[in-house]
Amino acid sequence: MLNEIKAKTKERMLKTIQSFHDDIKGVRTGRASASLLDGIVVNIYGGHQKLNQVAGVSVIDNKTLSIKIWDINVVGEVKNAILNANLNLNPVVEGNTIRIALPDLTQETREKLVKLLHQFAENARIAIRNIRRDIMEETEKMKENKEISEDDFHGAKKEIQNITDNNIKKIDGELSIKEKDILNH
């Protein structure tokens, strides 16, 4: 029973960590990264396609991305999707390739990005604590219904807190790395 509680806690918190990781991956640092365009969705073929399903994104140098579009007929839609993504990017079309020269980040922009990172981190911490609360309530009910003993309850409580603390440390560690990356480039 305790192993199930532990596994459930880890699984739910891992999803939160992965979501946080995806959120911060899309935040621009001073260097070009193909992951910057991961969230872009293109309206083509009567539906929505992720950019990486209609084109290959590669990094040319620290400040330039190249997008090789497989179907030349959708170049305009891809360009519009990039423009509408609110990433402050200026795509330049060259045949079936789009080049994006990333502008330098101003100090003000860097500070805004760091603020956004902190917001993502706080949301992830809150989600982790909410998961802890939910699991603790479930464990408390199990104790009240005599499904687990008092000792097992206290052991589970400690284990859940340890898992929570470790996941919050992971969030803080990723935040610190990304923050340094933004401020130092």
UniProtKB/Swiss-Prot annotation:
Report the protein's function. Responsible for the release of ribosomes from messenger RNA at the termination of protein biosynthesis. May increase the efficiency of translation by recycling ribosomes from one round of translation to another.
**One example GO MF annotation:** ribosomal large subunit binding
As for subcellular location, the record says: Cytoplasm
Stored InterPro entries: Ribosome_recyc_fac (IPR002661), Ribosome_recyc_fac_dom (IPR023584), RRF_sf (IPR036191)
Swiss-Prot/TrEMBL GO biological process terms: cytoplasmic translational termination
Q: Which CDD domains match?
A: RRF (cd00520)
Protein name listed in UniProt: Ribosome-recycling factor
Q: Which Pfam families match?
A: RRF (PF01765)
Q: Which family does it belong to?
A: Belongs to the RRF family.
Q: Which residues form the signal peptide?
A: none
Question: Which SUPFAM superfamilies does the protein's record reference?
Answer: Ribosome recycling factor, RRF
Record-level GO cellular component terms: cytosol
Where this protein primarily resides, as one coarse class? cytoplasm
Which keywords belong to this entry? Cytoplasm, Protein biosynthesis
